[in-house]
Amino acid sequence: MSWRPPVHDAPGIERNWYEACFRAHAGSCGCGNFIAHINLLAGRYGFTGGPPPPGGPPPGTPQVRASRNSPAAPQQPPALPWHGDGGEGGAAGPPGAGGDAAADAHLGDEELADLLDAIEDDAQCSNRRSKTRARRTDGPPTPIDTLEEYKWRTRNKWDPAGCSTPLTGEGAILARELSNACTRNLSTMKAILHNQKDLESFLQQRQQRESSESPKKAHIQRKKGRKPLQKSRRRRRQYSSSSDDSESSGSSSSSSNSSPEKCSKRKRVST
């Protein structure tokens, strides 16, 4: 592909070239001044370049300056003397030797004895505390059964030799847990009472329904018990009527049978 003339004019070409150089330098270095960087590299590798253009640089071009040297690191302040070095002669011996020697020189026999007694008392107190802690942490913590016992333990005076046992928390946490447990118990009791009231009302309504329906059922049962009696009576009546009919038919037949005999007798008598 053949080269073609650029589209931009001279100022546009220069701007694009400057921007390309700036971006290429920014891609590999972060100093922010690629002109000074190029001048430094040119002086290091002995590349002086061609002669300057005639007439000097165009007006408005920035003057190329050499990069400034980095400021020197601040000097470290002198180290302060260690506490107890013994003043001016602290460097002569180990730390703490001069001060302890001066303090021992100023203390008397009685003061030294008091100091030793205080050290022994502190050691004994620390041993007692460690023993009490070991004794308390060996066994499980004592449970709290009632609210009064919990209040008495929380309001009791603080024991300097005491310590917290395992599986126990602070007073605020225990109080919060206790209040949560109380609220849960209260809610369950309310639910139980509500269910009990509902059950009682249901039983009362059921009894009322049964009491209201019982006379109706008794009346219906009475009616059901009377029906077979009425049927038997009707049957008896039917039977009685049929017997009456048979008796009447029998009497009529007997009368009819007796009438010709009478007639025959009468005829015989007449002859």
Curated annotation (Swiss-Prot):
Keyword presence, Phosphoprotein: yes
Pfam families xref list = DUF755, TT_ORF2-like
* Ranges annotated as biased composition (Basic and acidic residues): 207-216
Q: Which domain of life is it from?
A: Viruses
PTM comment: Phosphorylated at C-terminal serines.
Q: Does the keyword Phosphoprotein apply?
A: yes
- UniProt protein name: Probable protein VP2
Source species, please?
Torque teno virus (isolate Human/Japan/SANBAN/1999) (TTV)
